[in-house]
């Protein structure tokens, strides 16, 4: 895995690349196009594979939930935009994606995967990296899975909600926090209010 330039608490590496958009058209997009929104940017190894469509379809099917949080989901792989489009145009029952609600970025030169530190150089493909970038373009969360295991849309949604909550309220979120759960005031005395309720 490459070391990359993606570091928590720092600006996420910008990119400009061709994507297949939800309307089926090709469009050059940049990360900077989404400034003012949260972004979930995830990499997957290859089009026309096995775990990848389950993840991409799961994120696409729930794109509206992310949109309600002012969050854009973007997928990326090293395949060409033509390959992405062919996969989108292949029916789900034949291993395709079907219509998408999220852009799929093409990274054939592997520069974006390299920048984000998810390039599996010996195979020229990406590990399953997922990056949460806040509305100021700052990288807040990184997860990287090895190739055989897919990611959880529920957990990604929870993390976006948690980061947005801490941004807005200045309180911190304990393990497993979900909207409506108790949070912790980051102060030695005030935090006791949370801990005093624990069993």
Swiss-Prot record:
Function: Thiol-specific peroxidase that catalyzes the reduction of hydrogen peroxide and organic hydroperoxides to water and alcohols, respectively. Plays a role in cell protection against oxidative stress by detoxifying peroxides and as sensor of hydrogen peroxide-mediated signaling events. Might participate in the signaling cascades of growth factors and tumor necrosis factor-alpha by regulating the intracellular concentrations of H(2)O(2). Reduces an intramolecular disulfide bond in GDPD5 that gates the ability to GDPD5 to drive postmitotic motor neuron differentiation.
UniProt region (Disordered), positions on chain: 176-199
A Gene Ontology BP annotation from the UniProt entry: regulation of non-canonical NF-kappaB signal transduction
Location of N6-succinyllysine modifications: 35
One Gene Ontology MF term: peroxidase activity
Positions of modified residues (N-acetylserine): 2
Residues the record lists as N6-acetyllysine modifications: 7, 16, 27, 35, 136, 197
PANTHER family reported for this sequence: PEROXIREDOXIN-1, THIOREDOXIN PEROXIDASE
PTM text: Phosphorylated on Thr-90 during the M-phase, which leads to a more than 80% decrease in enzymatic activity. Acetylation increases reducing activity and resistance to superoxidation. Deacetylated by HDAC6 which decreases reducing activity.
InterPro entries: AhpC/TSA (IPR000866), Peroxiredoxin (IPR050217), Peroxiredoxin_AhpC-typ (IPR024706), Peroxiredoxin_C (IPR019479), Thioredoxin-like_sf (IPR036249), Thioredoxin_domain (IPR013766)
EC number: 1.11.1.24
Phosphoserine found at: 32
Organism the protein comes from: Homo sapiens (Human)
One GO cellular component, as annotated: cytoplasm
PTM-bearing positions, type Phosphothreonine: 90
Protein name: Peroxiredoxin-1
Subcellular compartments: Cytoplasm; Melanosome
Keywords: Acetylation, Antioxidant, Cytoplasm, Disulfide bond, Isopeptide bond, Oxidoreductase, Peroxidase, Phosphoprotein, Redox-active center, Ubl conjugation
Crosslinked positions (Glycyl lysine isopeptide (Lys-Gly) (interchain with G-Cter in SUMO1)): 185
Biased composition (Basic and acidic residues): 184-199
UniProt induction comment: Constitutively expressed in most human cells; is induced to higher levels upon serum stimulation in untransformed and transformed cells.
Location in chain, cross-link Glycyl lysine isopeptide (Lys-Gly) (interchain with G-Cter in SUMO2): 7, 120
Other facts: The active site is a conserved redox-active cysteine residue, the peroxidatic cysteine (C(P)), which makes the nucleophilic attack on the peroxide substrate. The peroxide oxidizes the C(P)-SH to cysteine sulfenic acid (C(P)-SOH), which then reacts with another cysteine residue, the resolving cysteine (C(R)), to form a disulfide bridge. The disulfide is subsequently reduced by an appropriate electron donor to complete the catalytic cycle. In this typical 2-Cys peroxiredoxin, C(R) is provided by the other dimeric subunit to form an intersubunit disulfide.
UniProt similarity note: Belongs to the peroxiredoxin family. AhpC/Prx1 subfamily.
Reaction equation(s) it catalyzes: a hydroperoxide + [thioredoxin]-dithiol = an alcohol + [thioredoxin]-disulfide + H2O
Quaternary structure and partners: Homodimer; disulfide-linked, upon oxidation. 5 homodimers assemble to form a ring-like decamer. Interacts with GDPD5; forms a mixed-disulfide with GDPD5. Interacts with SESN1 and SESN2. Interacts with FAM107A.
Main location per the UniProt record: cytoplasm
């Amino acid at each position: 895995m490459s070391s990359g330039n993606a570091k928590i608490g720092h600006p996420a590496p910008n990119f400009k690349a061709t994507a297949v958009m939800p309307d089926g058209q090709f469009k050059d997009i940049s990360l900077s196009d989404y400034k003012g929104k949260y972004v979930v940017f995830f990499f997957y190894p290859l089009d026309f594979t096995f775990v990848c469509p389950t993840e991409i379809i799961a994120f696409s099917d729930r794109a509206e939930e992310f949109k309600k949080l002012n969050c854009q989901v973007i997928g990326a792989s090293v395949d060409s935009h033509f390959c992405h489009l062919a996969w989108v145009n292949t029916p789900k029952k034949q291993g395709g994606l079907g219509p998408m609600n999220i852009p799929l970025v093409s990274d054939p030169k592997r520069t974006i995967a390299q920048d984000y530190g998810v390039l599996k150089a010996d195979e020229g493909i990406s590990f399953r990296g997922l990056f949460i970038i806040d509305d100021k373009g700052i990288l807040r969360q990184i997860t990287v899975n090895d190739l055989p295991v897919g990611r959880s849309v529920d957990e990604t949604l929870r993390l976006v909600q948690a980061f947005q909550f801490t941004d807005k309220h200045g309180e911190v979120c304990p393990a497993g926090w979900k909207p409506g759960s108790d949070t912790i005031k980051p102060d030695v005395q005030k935090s006791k209010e949370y801990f005093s309720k624990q069993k």
